[in-house]
Amino acid sequence: MNRRHSTVRRLLGSTIAVALISAAPCAAQVTPAAASTPPDDTPKISVGATIFADYTVQQQPKVVDIDGNSVTLTQFQVGRSYINVTGNISHSIAFRITPDITREVAIGSSVNGSYVFRLKYAFLQWNFDDFMTHGAWARFGQQQTPYVDFMEGIYRYRFQGTIFEEREGFLSSSDVGASFHYNLAKNYGDIHAGVYNGETYSAPEINDQKGWMIRGTLRPLPMSEYLRGLRITGFYDHDMFAKNDDRKRAILSVTYEHKYVNAGYDYLDGQNRLNRAAPESDAKGYTMWVTPRTTIGWEGLFRFDHIDPNKSAPAQQRERTIAGVAYWFPHQGNVSTALLFDYDNATFTGFTPSLPTRRLYAVHALLNF
């Protein structure tokens, strides 16, 4: 098993390394045809922003105020605030820098409770459009991970909360590493593979182990009027807490996009062995969601998550139900503004000590440009 994983890692690493090393010379070898227009190498830079804001009522559980009264917690929050700086040095070299402004929650920190500035993305990108399919590239630095970024492009309600696999702690949206992306010809799908520190963007590397991730997506009927939005995705992540202490995630996903509805189903299998002496935990779960849409901006959101966190404790389950109504304001281009009124109910079964139901009602707002 270890020999097989080592072979996979060597092949994946070789692919990424060759892509990165070959980018510059391959681009230099391409000579535009006599009648073609040379690519635009004018340096460009643009600045954008993303804001997630909400007003949330925590109906359950109640909280106790300073006088010992049991009260319903209500709060205005800024869940996320990004400043996106993107640009091109030439038509083949691009970059992105995205600081993330979020609330510090570390106990004992001098800024506990304050909004703090940290780095979410900072990477260089080599575009291979000159000699590969359009949309092929390699990245180096702190960047989006293959699965979360892909799924957030289909499930548009990140401003309500993270996708199932990230919310349950199995994946992160960003990590430091190198990756390669390739679009299949004729819009049949794409492949995104990379090697990462594995500690996510919120922590430094702590040992010699790396996380190897690969996502492959197939669009079986790209020419069909009604089924071109159907995609089947497989994802695998093999990392280690330490040598021989596996941290593995496998996901099978089916998604569908249409003018009037987006929908998806994910099945997750995750294994963790925290250290040599610890038993391996085996988690299994799934999520299903649908977002019916109208042509006048109104959308619905319905989502159900289920996770069995450890096969050795079969009575333990976590479930979450999300339902809401959203209005997406009409804009030109890639600008997005939306308001979402939603209900979020999480239950916990079989845990010791027992955990209370967490029920939230909220108004979420999104601004992205």
Kindly give the residue locations of the regions a language model identified.
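N-terminal periplasmic/intermembrane-space "pro-region" immediately following the signal or transit peptide
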Residues: 1-66, 111, 369
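Outer membrane beta-barrel
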Residues: 33-60, 70-201, 206-213, 217-226, ...
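Detector for outer-membrane/organellar transmembrane beta-barrel domains
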Residues: 40, 209, 217-310, 319-320
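Extracytoplasmic loops and strand-loop junctions of Gram-negative outer membrane beta-barrel proteins
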Residues: 64-69, 159-164, 235-238, 272-274, ...
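A generic beta-sheet turn/junction motif
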Residues: 184-186, 256-260, 295, 332, ...
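Outer-membrane beta-barrel "beta-signal"
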Residues: 214-216, 323-329, 355-369
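C-terminal hydrophobic structural anchor segments
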Residues: 295-344
